[in-house]
């Protein structure tokens, strides 16, 4: 009887010390990202609301939604970025073969979206010169004069989008797009 009891105790201890289920260890614990902040953008005397949401449970189905609303609540910019596109257009040296790494990568993009260096005050400096990455030279010159602020965000490894408010056209436009 003692031998049987000893065998049961040792077996129990042995099983308790086994590592957990590998699939369970690789499971991704992810919460949707929902952040917002206010900054002057369309008007130097008012605060617009910048909002980002990262929704979805699997990287291929995730969507990063970014919008800007004027102080009065009117939406002036809205873009949806697919998680699969963000993953596909990244540094080829970055190993994103595992779903867990893809989720971490997308969450990092969302968490860093409102980094201070993405807010450009002003969007264009008076001494700046338009180059081949400026899609709208008229807007670029308008921004030099208005001194309105800009915002940049990344679409991929070498694809940054710079946006600003055009007082003349009363809408947000891309004023620079490059590396």
Residue ranges and their predicted role:
Residues 13-16:
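C-terminal motif of bacterial Sec signal peptides marking the signal peptidase cleavage site
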Residues 36-141:
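Surface-exposed acidic loop/strand-edge motifs in secreted or periplasmic proteins
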Residues 151-170:
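Short, exposed beta-strand-loop hairpins at the edges of beta-sheets
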Residues 2-8:
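Sec-dependent signal peptide recognition
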Residues 178-179:
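Short, solvent-exposed mixed-charge patches
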Residues 27-28:
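Acidic, negatively charged sequence signal
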Residues 53-55, 149-154:
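Short beta-strand segments that buttress and anchor functional surface loops
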Residues 18-21:
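Bacterial signal peptide processing site
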């Amino acid at each position: 009887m003692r031998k049987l009891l000893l065998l049961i105790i040792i077996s129990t201890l042995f099983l308790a010390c086994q590592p957990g289920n590998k699939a369970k260890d690789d499971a991704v614990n992810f919460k949707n990202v929902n952040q917002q902040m206010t900054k002057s953008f369309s008007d130097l005397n008012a605060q617009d609301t910048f909002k980002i949401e990262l929704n979805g449970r699997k990287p291929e189905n995730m969507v990063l939604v970014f919008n800007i609303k004027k102080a009065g609540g009117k939406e002036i910019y809205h873009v949806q970025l697919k998680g699969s596109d963000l993953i596909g257009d990244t540094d080829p040296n970055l190993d994103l073969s595992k779903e867990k790494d893809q989720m971490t990568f997308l969450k990092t993009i969302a968490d860093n979206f409102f980094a201070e260096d993405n807010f450009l005050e002003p969007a264009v400096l008076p001494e700046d010169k338009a180059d081949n990455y400026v899609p709208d030279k008229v807007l670029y010159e308008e921004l030099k004069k208005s001194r309105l602020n800009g915002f940049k965000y990344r679409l991929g490894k070498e694809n940054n989008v710079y946006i600003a408010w055009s007082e003349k056209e009363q809408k947000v436009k891309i004023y620079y797009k490059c590396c």
